[in-house]
Regions:
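Positively charged n-region of N-terminal signal peptides that target proteins for export
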Residues: 1-4
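Short helix-onset patch at the extreme N-terminus, typifying the N->h transition
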Residues: 6-9, 74
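Hydrophobic h-region of N-terminal signal peptides that target proteins for export
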Residues: 8-18
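Rhodanese-like catalytic fold shared by cysteine-dependent sulfurtransferases
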Residues: 18-38, 48, 52-107, 117-182
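Structural scaffold elements adjacent to functional motifs in cytosolic proteins
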Residues: 42-44
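Short, surface-exposed ligand- or partner-binding patches at beta-edge/loop junctions that are enriched
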Residues: 111-112
Length: 182
């Protein structure tokens, strides 16, 4: 029993170390971009339609959606359109690396709305696909929702926008994922 507990503790410790290793704060990410570190690719993994309504940071090198919205499929149980994983996600990331002359060992930083639904899973998928230095922005672009009070439900707690980092309601046509030109 004692050996089982020790093994479980070691396993938990390694999971905790992995979680720390894979996540970056918005401020840490911005500092890397400001230093113009040559071996970094910063990608926004949100659907371009979400970016159009929520905002975009031009600090991002490219928009490569991890999940896409299928507006022909309605999920009645959740009251939303169906989301599906972008089947070309890994190949599109490879293309962005190649455009910048970067290898699979480059630090790839992904950012979604909150960090947990697409940011972390996209970084994990990239690691599984041979990109050992994939990471994600903890709390993402909008951050967490406030739990209580008159602003309950609003994403005003943390994340890129709420950290005072640069963003705009406008998209950069040269960086956004577009099916008409790419």
């Amino acid at each position: 029993m004692k050996k089982l507990l020790i093994a479980a503790a070691i396993g938990f410790a390694s999971l905790t170390a992995h979680a720390t290793d894979i996540g970056l704060s918005a401020a840490e990410t911005y500092a890397k971009i400001q230093k113009a570190e040559p071996n970094v690719l910063f990608i926004d993994v949100r659907d371009p339609v979400e970016i159009m309504f929520v905002g975009f940071s031009d600090a991002v090198h490219a928009n490569v959606p991890f999940m896409l919205v299928d507006r022909t499929q309605w999920n009645a149980e959740k009251g939303v359109f169906r989301l599906y994983r972008n089947p070309d996600f890994v190949n599109q990331v490879k293309l962005e690396l190649a455009r910048r002359g970067l290898s699979a060992d480059a630090e790839i930083i992904t950012m979604c709305r909150s960090g947990s639904e697409r940011g972390e899973p996209s970084a994990a998928l990239l690691r599984e696909s041979g990109f050992p230095n994939a990471r994600y922005v903890i709390n993402g672009f909008q951050g967490d929702a406030i739990k209580d009070g008159p602003q309950a439900g609003f994403r005003l707690k943390n994340g890129w926008q709420n950290s005072g980092l640069p963003w705009s309601p406008r998209m950069n046509a040269d960086k956004i994922h577009r099916v008409d030109s790419r």
